[in-house]
Every structure is written in structure tokens, then in C-alpha cells.
Design a protein with these regions (language model features):
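N-terminal Rossmann-like dinucleotide-binding module
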Residues: 1-48
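C-terminal helix-rich "cap/oligomerization" subdomain common to oxidoreductases
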Residues: 1-5, 68-70, 264, 301, ...
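Beta-loop-alpha module in the N-terminal Rossmann-like domain of NAD(P)-dependent dehydrogenases
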Residues: 20, 51-111, 306
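Hydrophobic residues in well-ordered beta-strands that form the structural core
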Residues: 94, 119-121, 255
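Rossmann-fold dehydrogenase core element
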Residues: 107-124, 142-149
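C-terminal glycine/acidic-rich active-site capping loop/insertion
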Residues: 124, 220, 243-329
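Predominantly a Rossmann-like dinucleotide-binding segment in NAD(P)-dependent oxidoreductases
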Residues: 125-208, 214, 348
Length: 353
């Protein structure tokens, strides 16, 4: 740990912002100097109640002069907030997606390079031991791959309020899809070349052109294909709401959840329960050469534990001077695929990358 903790300004106190703030609160290398939220947050955790709270981001940035700014606001504010923070001398943690457009995402990366600041994007699955195991096991199979992934959420109450708020600017396949496209890209290492998307507005009161259910296919230059689906709202089915399959000619790797997991439970979105590794090899009688393997992942970090890991990674990236070039470029690449999927939904045309 550094002798003097890094001063952090936390911007955005929604579901993710609070989790990140609690991570800074418990980390010896960070000191929260202020919180920023456009309105007075309700039910703020007791651990955060004593910190100064402001409503104006620019004024708070000038007042507190932080070493680090943590941004968990609406996606369309990410780029401007991040660039302003780095111009003021702060390192930045920003929730995914990095920005609302690919051009803005590249602008943020360019600012990190210009100001020589660290930029970490909130790809929480990169800090999850079970997901890194999934990636390792899938890579052992060799490509080309078929990716089948989704995350549908039968949301109501506060969860539906959060989803409707996000959909003022960002569709489900962009907001959630960047996580799983990032996983696909880590497994295949191939270049995505085309995206085809479809979506349906199943909920009333959505902004013009917005949809709460969507799915897309992404094609890679090694022959791999990926499918991702995301739907939010009280109408969503919980049947097969969490599919995580990677298939190749040599077998498959799948996440198998515990029965009874709820689709709107944020911990269920990252917990894996068990990983099933299936081998395709057959003997002379066309019988399996190797039995399926079950990797038990119970006891893994919960959602708060994963946020703690993310912020520890940020701390080490700053204090140990990590080269984050690949990290930043990957964030832009996964966003590019999901933005193309959103464009395909809206135009009805496949998008070449």
C-alpha cells in the first residue's frame, strides 16, 4: 500500500455506484473524499452516509481534486465525465459500457494516452475466478467456436425501475452484451467481421426506437459464430434465462446454475455454481473416450466481492503502473460489436465491421 491513500471521487450512486463506493470504503489504499449524485440518494448504506455529497460533478471535481474518479452514471455521460477527470489529473474507473458511441469510447482512450492516466473499465467478469476458468477451459478445446450466451431478467419493482432508467439511452444488448462479447473475444482471439441483430419493444413507455428484448449474432474471421440475447421486464420468461455455452469440434464448456436461481438477482448474474466440461472424442465403437468433468465453483465471490476485486485491480494498475493498452482496446472492441448489433436492430440490415 502507498503511504498516502488515493483520494477517490465517486460519481453515481445507483446499484453499481454504491457497490464500488463500498469497495473503496473498505480498501486501505483508497480514501473517499466525496460522492456525487444528481439527486439525494435513498437508503444510502450506513458506511457511506458520512461522506460529503454533491450534485454538481464539475464543481466537485474542482473542489475535491481527487486522484481517482469512479464513474457509474448513465452511459451517455461516461465519455465527457471521464475526459474531464483525466484532464484534471485523475485516473478513472468507469462502468461499462465505456461510452454511448464507439467514437466517444476512442476519445476516452485517447485522453488516457494524452494525459498519461490509468483507465479501467468495469468488466466485472474479468475479475471472476470462475469466468477465467471458463475461458481457459474453452481455449483448450480450440476453435472455431459456437458461443451461446444470454442474460434475461424478469425484473419488477426497483429492478424494473433501474432497467427503464438505463433504457432511456442504452438497450439491453449493449448494456449487458459488452460483458459476454468480451468473453467471446478472449476465447477466440479472432477478428469479428459481421453482426446481425433483432429486437422487439415488449414494454410500454419506452423511448422512441428503444426495445427491451434483443438478440444478435456475431461472425468472426476464423469461422466462429456467437449468439447473445438480453431481455428485461416483468414479462420475461425465466426459462433458460442464463445460457452460457461454448462449443467446438472437440467438445463444450458450459456454466450450469443451481435450480431456482432468480433472473433479477444481481448475484446470479455473475455466480457460476458449476462448470461442465464435455469432451467430443469417441472410441472405435463411437462411445465417449472421456467422461464429462464437473468443476465445482460454489464459494465464489458474491457481487460485492467482485466489485472489491475490481477496485483492487484499479489500485494495483495505478500503483504498479500496469500497461492497460490491451484492456482499453478490448473495451472499445466489445462496444463496437454491441453498437453494431444495436444499429442492425434499428436498420434491419447486417453490419460489416
Amino acid at each position: 500500500m502507498t503511504a498516502t491513500p488515493l483520494k477517490v471521487l465517486v460519481v453515481g450512486l445507483g446499484q453499481m455506484g454504491r457497490s464500488h463506493a463500498l469497495a473503496y470504503h473498505s480498501h486501505e489504499g483508497f480514501e473517499i473524499v466525496g460522492l456525487v449524485n444528481r439527486s439525494a440518494p435513498s437508503n444510502l448504506p450506513e458506511d457511506l452516509a458520512s461522506y460529503p455529497l454533491r450534485t454538481d460533478y464539475a464543481a466537485a471535481l474542482a473542489e475535491f481534486k481527487p486522484d481517482v474518479v469512479s464513474i457509474a452514471t448513465h452511459t451517455n455521460t461516461h465519455a465527457d465525465y471521464a475526459v474531464a477527470a483525466m484532464a484534471a489529473g485523475a485516473h478513472v474507473f468507469v462502468e461499462k459500457p465505456l461510452a454511448a458511441t464507439v467514437a466517444d469510447a476512442r476519445r476516452v482512450v485517447a485522453a488516457a494516452e494524452e494525459y498519461k492516466r490509468k483507465l479501467v473499465v468495469g468488466y466485472i467478469l474479468r475479475h471472476h475466478p470462475s469466468w477465467t476458468t471458463l475461458i481457459e477451459q474453452a481455449r483448450k478445446l480450440g476453435g472455431p467456436y459456437v458461443f451461446r450466451m444470454n442474460l434475461n431478467q424478469q425484473s419488477s419493482g426497483a429492478a424494473w425501475d433501474i432497467h427503464r432508467s438505463i433504457m432511456q439511452t442504452t438497450s439491453p444488448i449493449v448494456d449487458c452484451g459488452v460483458h459476454y462479447v468480451d468473453v467471446m473475444c478472449q476465447i477466440t482471439d479472432a477478428t469479428p467481421v459481421e453482426v446481425r441483430g433483432m429486437g422487439v419493444p415488449l414494454a410500454k413507455g419506452l423511448p422512441e426506437g428503444m426495445y427491451n428484448y434483443g438478440h444478435f449474432q456475431v461472425l468472426f474471421d476464423d469461422g466462429s459464430v456467437g449468439w447473445y440475447e438480453a431481455g428485461w421486464g416483468p414479462m420475461m420468461s425465466e426459462t433458460a434465462f442464463f445460457v452460457k455455452d461454448v462449443i467446438s469440434a472437440n467438445g463444450s464448456v458450459s456454466i450450469v446454475m443451481d435450480q431456482g436461481a432468480a433472473s433479477a438477482d444481481i448475484n446470479a448474474h455473475t455466480q457460476t455454481s458449476r462448470i461442465l466440461v464435455h469432451h467430443a472424442g469417441l472410441d472405435a465403437d463411437n462411445k465417449p473416450l472421456k467422461a464429462d468433468e464437473w468443476l465445482d465453483m460454489h464459494g465464489e465471490p458474491d457481487h460485492q466481492g467482485l466489485c472489491d476485486r475490481e477496485q483492487d485491480y484499479l489500485y494495483r494498475a495505478i500503483t504498479e503502473d500496469y500497461d492497460l493498452t490491451r484492456h482499453m482496446n478490448d473495451a472499445v472492441a466489445s462496444l463496437n460489436i454491441c453498437i453494431a448489433a444495436d444499429e442492425s436492430v434499428r436498420t434491419g440490415q447486417a453490419v460489416k465491421l
